[in-house]
Amino acid sequence: MAGKRSGVRITGETVHTYDLHVIAADVDGIVTAAGGWLCDRARAGWQVTVTVPPDRDVRALTILGLDVDTHEPALHALPGTAAVAVDARVLRDDERLRERVLSLVDAARAEVTVWGDPSPVGPDGRFDRVVHRLSAAARAFKARALQTTGQVAPDLAVETFVSAALWYPPDGADLMPLPER
């Protein structure tokens, strides 16, 4: 990791690279809720690393082109990463992690994206509802990954999240705000 210097943003002394660290409660949930977006990020050159609990079958994640880390706790990976994605169930159950993730948002240190019930991050306006439209490749890889987990492929065209600190340019964004209802 030390040799990587393909920075996308400089804030003060920190160079952020195209690194996305993902913290998931389980493999099935991440593939269903965020597999296409993560696959598209990996195919676009991001280093996507998923932390899942130990002793899980991670074949579906490797199909999506993702690296897997089964170390716990996942807090060690958060400093210096350009983006963090977290399962809302993990945020609900781990107060220390929730506080750490929200501190990244408050300090504008990283893009933070959450899938699932957004209530653990609060309704205070720091997070916006966003959507990712899956590429054809991501739809195909996600369908295969879902088969590996024994799940039936749902509508694979879009995935929705809540996200904060969208720092990349609007013309290159892969997470687009949802219109207000």
Language model: regions and residue ranges:
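Short acidic low-complexity segments
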Residues: 70-79
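Structural motif
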Residues: 23-27, 52-54, 85-93, 115-118
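A polyampholytic, Gly/Pro-enriched intrinsically disordered region
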Residues: 88-92, 97, 133-138
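Glycine-rich, aromatic-bearing surface loops/beta-hairpins
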Residues: 109-181
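Extended, compositionally biased accessory segments flanking or bridging domains
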Residues: 1-63, 68-69
